[in-house]
Amino acid sequence: MIKEISVPKLKKPVFIAAWPGMGEVAYRSVVFLREAMGFKVFAKLEAGDFFKPAAIFVERGILGLPSLPAGFFSYLKRKNQPDIILFLGEAQPPLEYAEALSETIINFVKKYGASSMLTFAAKPEPIDHKADPGVWAASTNVTILKDLEPFGIKALKEGQISGLNGIILGVAKRKGIKGTCLLGEIPFYTVQIENPRASMNILKALSNYLNLGLNLSPLQERSKFIEEEIDKLVGYIKGEENAAPVPAIPTPLSEDDVDRIKKDLAAYSKLPQSVRERIEGFFKEAQKDMTKANALKRELDHWHVYHEYEDRFLDLFKKQSKEKGSH
């Protein structure tokens, strides 16, 4: 079910959709685009028909159903340019629901006059994580592929695009909407790790194609930071105290290695100062009143930094247990 918050009047909107996937390329690209250009949310997809809970959660002995993933539509009105509709899904549904979910979304954006759409995806390649990733395109329309060539985007000759970032394009074609996927190269050995450089190159191409005028310097800084951390962590994992430059094509990292890198990247993530101050405020409140711990946990999860604060968060409960035991 899609609930409309408002009904904007849009002119020939281009539709862009994304879900989480390899390297977080698609998801992070759309998050950046939405925040950088000030898109306004106008509808919410409540995907209860497409997601089923796999378990229930327990909090202080009380059982409850988990919140199901949702998706949000937002829009941007532009002068003398086609407007844009964005859709950002919080998670991909089981494969058997992918086509039905795609139809629901496509039918909705057609109502607003969308006749073309874009998705993003990762293209794993045997490249170094500091290499400048190429951008490829696959489309339902030959003319679009030719229009993309001047921006350094190469046509994908063969392959497949898995998940909703690909499936929705097939549904769009069936519904009369031209669909194109932009794929950013990422290293084989870091498919589970955020890759802002791939997102940056995709958005650079998109910005040129749609005349967006994006400032991508924040992604450039984030790319440098993550690449340096991967260098240090790969060196540490390989047992090198003074990590030498990573080989051009390193061997794939194990799941444990990837988990370690993810945790370290989370620990070093640069939150805005205002957010850190708000988190510290929640900690102080929770020390006085444990009912505030739920709000603290939600804030940590929202910013994806729970692991950074996990020990301190759990210490709140240990301290409470000791105080109860002393009474």
Residue ranges and their predicted role:
Residues 1-89:
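N-terminal short beta-loop-beta anion/metal-coordinating cradle
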Residues 126-209, 226-247:
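Catalytic cores of processing enzymes, dominated by hydrolases/peptidases
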Residues 80-104:
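Ordered, amphipathic secondary-structure segments that act as subunit-interaction surfaces
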